[in-house]
UniProtKB/Swiss-Prot annotation:
GO terms for cellular component: cytoplasm; cytoskeleton. Its main location: cytoplasm. Pfam families: Thymosin. InterPro entries: Beta-thymosin (IPR001152), Beta-thymosin_sf (IPR038386). The modification N-acetylserine is found at S2. This is Thymosin beta-11. Keywords: Acetylation, Actin-binding, Cytoplasm, Cytoskeleton. PROSITE patterns: THYMOSIN_B4. Plays an important role in the organization of the cytoskeleton. Binds to and sequesters actin monomers (G actin) and therefore inhibits actin polymerization.
């Protein structure tokens, strides 16, 4: 491995080979209602 990037590889990279994926949030932020409920519960 060399420190310099191989620009030929980057230039010849075919974006159409990439699969389109659906992003799914693993850790969605809690809503304000959820936060209030947790504050009142403790």
């Amino acid at each position: 491995m060399s420190d310099k990037p191989n620009l030929e590889e980057v230039a010849s990279f075919d974006k159409t080979k990439l699969k389109k994926t659906e992003t799914q949030e693993k850790n969605p932020l809690p809503t304000k209602e959820t936060i209030e409920q947790e504050k009142q519960a403790s």
